Amino acid sequence: MQIFIKTLTGKTITLEVEGSDNIENVKAKIQDKEGIPPDQQRLIFAGKQLEDGRTLSDYNIQKESTLHLVLRLRGGGGKKKKKKTYATPKVLKRKLRKVKLAVLKYYKFDENGKIKRVLRECPAETCGAGVFMAQHANRQYCGKCHSTLVKKSK
């Protein structure tokens, strides 16, 4: 029977084969006509690659069927990218610790049972409520408006 082989260049080759012929025999005939070694040939029929150990009848290839010839690509992914090495270790992100009832550290109870605020709010109008002043040994400092209140020494 006669089958057609279509190459990537668009050229069509005609081959005389039998249904019992192996795929290796077909590749050998293509090598005789085109000079392409069988190990570089890939034959495709009905979207499937034809394996060397099978026959044409295994793939239901009949007379005047068209096989597509593509070349096998050798090689792989090329040069691998080298992993970067750093001289200093990577700085880990700080993990926030959730403290239960953390607000209580801003307030104290005096001997009468009254609540007293430990931190002082900034008196400046630009800061507003909720901006506390930092406690130093001899002064109080606002980090937002940079105002400083000096403590009176006894």
UniProtKB/Swiss-Prot annotation:
Pfam families the record matches: Ribosomal_S27 (PF01599), ubiquitin (PF00240)
InterPro entries: Ribosomal_eS31, Ribosomal_eS31_euk-type_sf, Ribosomal_zn-bd, Ubiquitin-like_dom, Ubiquitin-like_domsf, Ubiquitin_CS, Ubiquitin_dom, Ubiquitin_ubiquitin-like
Residues in C4-type zinc fingers: 122-145
Transmembrane regions: none
SMART domains: Ribosomal_S27, UBQ
Keywords on record: Cytoplasm, Isopeptide bond, Metal-binding, Nucleus, Ribonucleoprotein, Ribosomal protein, Ubl conjugation, Zinc, Zinc-finger
Cross-link (Glycyl lysine isopeptide (Gly-Lys) (interchain with K-? in acceptor proteins)): G76
Sequence position, cross-link Glycyl lysine isopeptide (Lys-Gly) (interchain with G-Cter in ubiquitin): K48
One Gene Ontology biological process: translation
Domain Ubiquitin-like residues, every copy: 1-75
MF (Gene Ontology): protein tag activity; structural constituent of ribosome; ubiquitin protein ligase binding; zinc ion binding
Cellular compartments per GO CC: cytoplasm; nucleus; ribonucleoprotein complex; ribosome
UniProt-listed Gene3D superfamilies: 6.20.50.150, Phosphatidylinositol 3-kinase Catalytic Subunit, Chain A, domain 1
SUPFAM superfamilies per UniProt: Ubiquitin-like (SSF54236), Zn-binding ribosomal proteins (SSF57829)
PANTHER family given in the database record: UBIQUITIN
Family: In the N-terminal section; belongs to the ubiquitin family.
Additional record remark: Ubiquitin is synthesized as a polyubiquitin precursor with exact head to tail repeats. Some ubiquitin genes contain a single copy of ubiquitin fused to a ribosomal protein. In D.discoideum there are 9 genes: ubqA: 5 copies of Ub and a final Asn; ubqB: 1 copy of Ub and ribosomal protein eL40; ubqC: 1 copy of Ub and ribosomal protein eS31; ubqD: 3 copies of Ub and a final Leu; ubqF: 7 copies of Ub and a final Asn; ubqG: 5 copies of Ub and a final Leu; ubqH: 5 copies of Ub and a final Asn; ubqI: 4 copies of Ub and a final Asn; ubqJ: 4 copies of Ub and a final Asn.
Protein name: Ubiquitin-ribosomal protein eS31 fusion protein
